[in-house]
Design a protein with these regions (language model features):
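Solvent-exposed helix-loop boundary motif
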Residues: 15-98, 102-134, 146-151, 157-169, ...
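Beta-propeller blade termini and top-face loops
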Residues: 192, 197-199, 203-215, 245-284
């Protein structure tokens, strides 16, 4: 019976005319386009197969007539089949090509390059449930209130919920009111600023070998305020790319241009400043393309993009937008905006009109071999610059957020979705091009993009997602559902994924009551192992912060590019050298060792122990669980906790010297004469908790 079903399904699939985007484009990209695509330097025999005109002009493809299409003859040749290297096309792939050609060889544009179309449905749950129905699946039940409260707080603010807000929600069940309180919390801006700073390749040092300190933290603070103030995303974009060119821009607006001053500066003696200025411009182009357009523009700096619509010439037309800034690869990192007597920050500044540089195409990307001069412009495959837009960075920024742009809203909506569900509707967040992964729910993506584009309201978008039944689902999974949808791409259950590095640390400190609420200002230096900065030869030292600064959010921790903060690095945080569109997620022994040995976690554990003993002396382990996860343990969890408690007590009674080791990094919490209030008496073996 199973084989009959498989055969019938396969027959049904073959009966349909192949779809160009789903079936043919990936096949051509994999087997043909490297030699017969848009890159004129790599093109063989003058043949293009990525466009209808290119493929039909040479009769490689004769629409409706596969027998006379040379492409079929070449890929099926008995002794010299194409492609000349690698595996030849399978019988199934040949059959797909044949059916597609006989069906008219219809080429369609890549989905991401077409403007979003408004679908019939108008809600997130409509599209999710429709897809589930196609696969004969049903949504999971709604998670309990405590779980939802913790999920939303960690997603929106990066820390567990505050006691008052949690208690109110658990009592009245008004989730919308609770979510609004999270948006009003200043910690919301800190959470989403950190996500944006990954894209901005933010760090507190210049990078490269010397990696000297630089002052750019006011840009970090600007991003926090922008999210808390719900600055419309189009203005958020324009200020970061071109506030210095925007009429009537304020000092705060100018700080926003730090986005592209986060590029690295090489101050080592003997380096060519122009070489590294050129590298910085390329970085700005690649970063802009990925952050706003989901495009790998950096691939076109040496040759025309092999797969996506950006020629070698067009790369340098974009280069011209960024080639007119006053910054260069200089130790002073000028231009610098003086804010106060003790604070300054790096900003962008356009060159005067009579100082403007000429931009030339660099042969094979080598700045030492300049070719033809080009003027600033945008890729021809996309919409032109807005009619009244200037041909500078300001006009380019306006082009990015134009209603005609098919990508910016989609890419941005997808990024926000990804941070709430662990994966985007388009999994390849960094690549919406032809080599990327297509959307799991294309109509839903278009709906969210079109609605977001109306007013570019980030909080409204996030609220819409977290208020959906899809977001509220329980993350419990049955073996059958895990088998049918292991990656949860159909969203039949709530998301379950590891917290970001900063949230892992911050939620531990918050649960223990240690996390400082202090915002803004210069970076701080919580404890890190001695000697970590010895890899940097510039003589800088890590001066461990004292008091409240020791317990500030990880967002404020000093970031050195060549020597990342160890506990953040172990949980996959980037070092700021390049734009990080999405972090990898690993599970390694180093993470367990970090949570067991890093003083931040040890001090959090000590404070939590004290709270648990004080509030529930008869069952402190259960109270610990409730303080961290905001719910009582299940029977199975309680049994495991009880076993762990007994094992720990036995170990401490037999090895009292471990007490001193556990407390050695504590700065202000506990001293050895107070240990008896936290653990069973190691000398008498008493089991009761004091």
């Amino acid at each position: 019976m199973r084989w009959i079903l498989h055969i019938s399904l396969a027959a049904g699939a073959f009966a349909q005319t192949p779809d160009f985007q789903r079936d043919i484009r990936p096949l051509l990209a994999k087997k043909c386009v490297a030699c017969h695509g848009p890159d004129e330097q790599a093109r063989q025999a003058g043949l293009r197969l990525d466009t209808f005109d290119g493929a039909t002009k040479a009769r490689a493809i004769v629409p409706g007539d596969s027998e006379n299409s040379r492409l079929l003859a070449r890929v099926t040749h008995a002794t010299r089949p194409m492609p000349p290297t690698g595996p030849r096309l399978t019988d199934t792939e040949v059959s797909l090509l044949r059916k597609w050609i006989d069906g008219g060889a219809v080429y369609t544009n890549h989905w991401a390059y077409e403007k979003p179309k408004r679908p019939a449905g108008n809600s997130i749950d409509y599209f999710i449930q429709a897809k589930l129905a196609e696969h004969r699946l049903t949504p999971s039940k709604e998670a309990d209130r405590a779980t939802l409260a913790r999920r939303a707080a960690l997603d929106l603010t990066g820390v567990p919920p505050e006691a008052s807000g949690l208690a109110a929600y658990l009592k009245d069940g008004n989730f919308e009111k609770y979510v609004d309180s999270l948006f009003a919390n200043p910690q919301y801006g800190e959470r989403w600023a950190k996500i944006w700073l990954d894209l901005a390749r933010y760090a507190d040092t210049q990078g490269y070998e010397k990696d000297n300190k630089r002052s750019i933290w006011p840009y970090r603070d600007w991003v926090i305020r922008a999210f808390n103030d719900n600055l419309p995303f189009d203005k958020f974009t324009i200020l970061q790319l071109a506030a210095d060119l925007t009429p009537d821009s304020s000092i705060d607006d100018l700080i926003a241009t730090g986005f592209h001053r986060n590029t690295m500066t090489n101050t080592e003696g003997g380096t060519d400043d122009e070489e590294y200025r050129d590298i910085a411009i390329r970085d700005r182009i690649a970063t802009t393309g990925q952050v706003w357009m989901g495009q790998t523009w950096g691939c076109a700096q040496c040759h025309t993009h092999r797969y996506d619509p950006l020629t070698h010439k067009e790369f340098y037309q974009i280069y011209a937008f960024f080639n007119q800034t006053a910054d260069d690869d200089h130790p002073s990192d000028r231009p610098v905006l003086k804010l106060t007597s003790s604070a300054s920050t790096l900003v962008m500044k356009e060159l005067a009109e009579d100082k403007q540089r000429k931009t030339r195409i660099y042969d094979r990307g080598n700045y030492l071999t300049p070719g033809d001069e080009v003027k600033a412009g945008v890729p021809a495959a996309f919409h032109p610059l807005p009619a009244k837009a200037p041909k500078n960075r300001l006009g380019f920024a306006q082009w990015l957020v134009s209603p005609e742009n098919p990508l910016t809203a989609r890419v941005t909506v997808n990024r926000f979705w990804s941070r709430l569900f662990g994966t985007g509707l388009v999994e390849s967040e960094e690549d919406f091009g032809t080599q990327g992964i297509g959307p799991t729910h294309a109509e839903l993506l278009d709906l969210l993009a079109l609605d977001f584009q109306k007013d570019w309201d980030v909080k409204k978008l996030l609220k819409r997602i977290v208020m959906s039944a899809t977001y509220k689902q329980s993350s419990d999974v049955t073996p059958e559902l895990l088998r049918l949808d292991p990656a949860n791409k159909l969203y039949a259950r709530g998301a379950r994924f590891r917290l970001d590095a900063e949230v892992v640390r911050d939620q531990a400190l918050a649960a223990a009551g240690l996390l400082s609420g202090k915002q803004f200002g210069p970076p701080v230096m919580p404890w890190q192992p001695d000697g970590v900065w010895l890899v940097v030869y510039n003589g800088d030292n890590w001066a461990t912060s004292k008091g409240e600064d020791r317990y500030r959010r990880a967002l404020y921790t000093f970031m050195r590019r060549t020597s990342a903060y160890p506990s953040m690095m172990n949980f996959d945080a980037p070092n700021g050298e390049t734009c990080t569109i999405r972090r990898i997620r690993t599970n390694t022994p180093l993470q367990a060792l970090t949570s067991l040995n890093d003083p931040a976690f040890m001090e959090a554990a000590q404070r939590l122990a004290g709270k648990a003993v004080k509030e529930s002396p008869q069952d402190p382990a259960k109270r610990l669980f409730e303080l961290v996860l905001l719910r009582p343990p299940t029977k199975a969890e309680a049994a495991r906790l009880s076993l762990l408690q007994r094992q720990t007590e036995a170990e401490l009674r037999t090895q009292p010297e471990n007490v001193s080791k556990l407390l050695r990094y504590s700065e202000v919490l506990y001293t050895e004469d107070r240990v008896a209030t936290l653990i069973p008496d190691a000398r008498t073996g008493a089991r009761e908790w004091r």
